[in-house]
């Protein structure tokens, strides 16, 4: 009765674990499908916006004369959209065939990885790289599950069986000799066993030759190294002339922080001066941060302006042409730190390549930087 009860409880526990694992797999698969649908929806909205911008009332519109750099950007955007679509399709296909990939010995996972490697050659932006990382996480999980199901079928070493085979090999049988251990046997039988084993083993082993010293053994004591006179003369010469190398000082992190704060305050003063001079006119974000003569200085300006936006001294939004602009904020809202809902904050990432910087300078016709160098 107790055995039946234990078997019933064990079966219930196994069924419970199976139900929990299936529920967890269903939730994970549902979350992945929702993420893919959300990304496809955002992609469709982007395509609809571009389609509405390109449409016009003229039934036979003439092709607009676009700048070659802008035309290259449009082609690059279409290429990136195609890569994202292929990544999503690849992820969806692997998720649908998850059980077949794990339970069978097919090369579907390897083919999917090769396809992802081909797609990764055309990746140049963050969104495509994020999809590639998502696929790699999925592929690594599938590879881990396949590795767990491997069956090596290795034969473990059995010492008892080995002893029986060894005794049969040398021609010794326990049944014929009527003894169970070597202590019960005669000394002649034991010596003959080890003698035959020795003869067989020596034929499979190579003996290393002895080492003969040609000039005798090495000396135990190491000879003292003679000092080099050249280094001593050079050191005396440096001490006499007084030209000593500069010592490396410890890096001061606070000094770098103070430099950053001073630069942010200087750029904030320039921005506030512009707002006081033109209170009703927002300033273009690109015209404010872009330095037409230095790409590195442009990146530094974007970095410093981000602190101004974070602290609430200015805000950034899109105008009618979907271009970013800078506007002043209400000072009373910034000073009131107790009210956390006084203004809404959003966080974003700006990616700017060297080619994008050149295109912005030529498109906006920026000839002079609004933020002058302080050095």
UniProtKB/Swiss-Prot annotation:
<dbReference type="GO" id="GO:0000781">
    <property type="term" value="C:chromosome, telomeric region"/>
</dbReference>
<dbReference type="Pfam" id="PF08743">
    <property type="entry name" value="Nse4_C"/>
</dbReference>
<dbReference type="GO" id="GO:0030915">
    <property type="term" value="C:Smc5-Smc6 complex"/>
</dbReference>
<keyword id="KW-0227">DNA damage</keyword>
<keyword id="KW-0678">Repressor</keyword>
<dbReference type="Pfam" id="PF15412">
    <property type="entry name" value="Nse4-Nse3_bdg"/>
</dbReference>
<feature type="region of interest" description="Disordered">
    <location>
        <begin position="30"/>
        <end position="68"/>
    </location>
</feature>
<keyword id="KW-0234">DNA repair</keyword>
<keyword id="KW-0963">Cytoplasm</keyword>
<dbReference type="InterPro" id="IPR029225">
    <property type="entry name" value="Nse4_Nse3-bd"/>
</dbReference>
<keyword id="KW-0779">Telomere</keyword>
<keyword id="KW-0539">Nucleus</keyword>
<protein>
    <recommendedName>
        <fullName>EP300-interacting inhibitor of differentiation 3</fullName>
    </recommendedName>
</protein>
<comment type="function">
    <text>Tissue-specific component of the SMC5-SMC6 complex, a complex involved in repair of DNA double-strand breaks by homologous recombination. The complex may promote sister chromatid homologous recombination by recruiting the SMC1-SMC3 cohesin complex to double-strand breaks. The complex is required for telomere maintenance via recombination and mediates sumoylation of shelterin complex (telosome) components.</text>
</comment>
<keyword id="KW-0175">Coiled coil</keyword>
<dbReference type="GO" id="GO:0005737">
    <property type="term" value="C:cytoplasm"/>
</dbReference>
<dbReference type="GO" id="GO:0006310">
    <property type="term" value="P:DNA recombination"/>
</dbReference>
<comment type="similarity">
    <text>Belongs to the NSE4 family.</text>
</comment>
<comment type="function">
    <text>Acts as a repressor of nuclear receptor-dependent transcription possibly by interfering with CREBBP-dependent coactivation. May function as a coinhibitor of other CREBBP/EP300-dependent transcription factors.</text>
</comment>
<dbReference type="GO" id="GO:0005654">
    <property type="term" value="C:nucleoplasm"/>
</dbReference>
<feature type="coiled-coil region">
    <location>
        <begin position="23"/>
        <end position="51"/>
    </location>
</feature>
<keyword id="KW-0158">Chromosome</keyword>
<keyword id="KW-0233">DNA recombination</keyword>
<comment type="subunit">
    <text>Component of the SMC5-SMC6 complex which consists at least of SMC5, SMC6, NSMCE2, NSMCE1, NSMCE4A or EID3 and NSMCE3; EID3 seems to be a testis-specific subunit. NSMCE1, NSMCE4A or EID3 and NSMCE3 probably form a subcomplex that bridges the head domains of the SMC5:SMC6 heterodimer. Homodimer, and heterodimer with EID2. Interacts with the C-terminal region of CREBBP.</text>
</comment>
<dbReference type="GO" id="GO:0006281">
    <property type="term" value="P:DNA repair"/>
</dbReference>
<dbReference type="InterPro" id="IPR014854">
    <property type="entry name" value="Nse4_C"/>
</dbReference>
<dbReference type="InterPro" id="IPR027786">
    <property type="entry name" value="Nse4/EID"/>
</dbReference>
<keyword id="KW-0804">Transcription</keyword>
<keyword id="KW-0805">Transcription regulation</keyword>
<dbReference type="GO" id="GO:0005730">
    <property type="term" value="C:nucleolus"/>
</dbReference>
<feature type="compositionally biased region" description="Acidic residues">
    <location>
        <begin position="42"/>
        <end position="60"/>
    </location>
</feature>
């Amino acid at each position: 009765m107790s055995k039946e009860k234990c078997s019933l409880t064990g079966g219930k526990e196994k069924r419970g674990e199976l139900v929990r694992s299936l529920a967890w797999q269903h939730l994970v698969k549902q979350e992945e499908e929702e993420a893919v649908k959300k990304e496809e929806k955002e992609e469709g909205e982007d395509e609809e916006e571009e389609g509405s911008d390109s449409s016009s009332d003229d039934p036979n519109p003439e092709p607009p004369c676009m700048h070659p750099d802008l035309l290259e950007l449009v082609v690059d955007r279409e290429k990136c959209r195609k890569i994202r679509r292929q990544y999503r399709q690849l992820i969806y296909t692997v998720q649908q065939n998850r059980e077949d990939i794990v339970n069978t010995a097919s090369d579907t996972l390897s083919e999917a990885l090769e396809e992802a490697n081909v797609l990764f050659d055309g990746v140049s932006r963050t969104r495509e790289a994020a999809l590639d990382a998502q696929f790699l996480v999925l592929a690594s999980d599938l590879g881990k599950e396949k590795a767990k199901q491997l069956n090596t079928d290795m034969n473990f070493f059995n010492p008892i069986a080995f002893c029986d085979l060894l005794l049969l090999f040398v021609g010794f049988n326990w049944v014929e000799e009527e003894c169970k251990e070597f202590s019960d046997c005669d000394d002649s039988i034991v010596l003959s066993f080890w003698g035959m084993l020795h003869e067989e083993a020596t034929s499979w082993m190579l003996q290393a030759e002895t080492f003969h010293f040609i000039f005798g053994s090495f000396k135990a004591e190491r000879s003292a190294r003679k000092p080099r006179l050249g280094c001593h003369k050079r050191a005396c010469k440096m001490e006499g002339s007084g030209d000593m190398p500069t010592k490396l000082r410890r890096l001061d992190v606070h000094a770098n922080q103070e430099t950053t704060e001073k630069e942010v305050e200087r750029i904030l003063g320039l921005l506030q001066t512009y707002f006081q001079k033109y209170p009703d006119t927002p300033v273009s974000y690109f015209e404010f941060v872009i330095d037409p003569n230095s790409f590195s200085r442009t990146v530094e300006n974007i970095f410093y302006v981000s602190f101004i936006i974070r602290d609430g001294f200015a805000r950034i939004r899109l105008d009618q042409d979907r271009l970013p602009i800078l506007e002043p904020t209400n000072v009373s809202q910034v000073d009131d730190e107790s009210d956390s809902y006084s203004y809404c904050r959003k966080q974003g990432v700006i990616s700017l390549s060297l080619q994008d910087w050149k295109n912005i300078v030529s498109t906006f016709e920026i000839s002079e930087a609004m933020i002058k160098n302080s050095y």
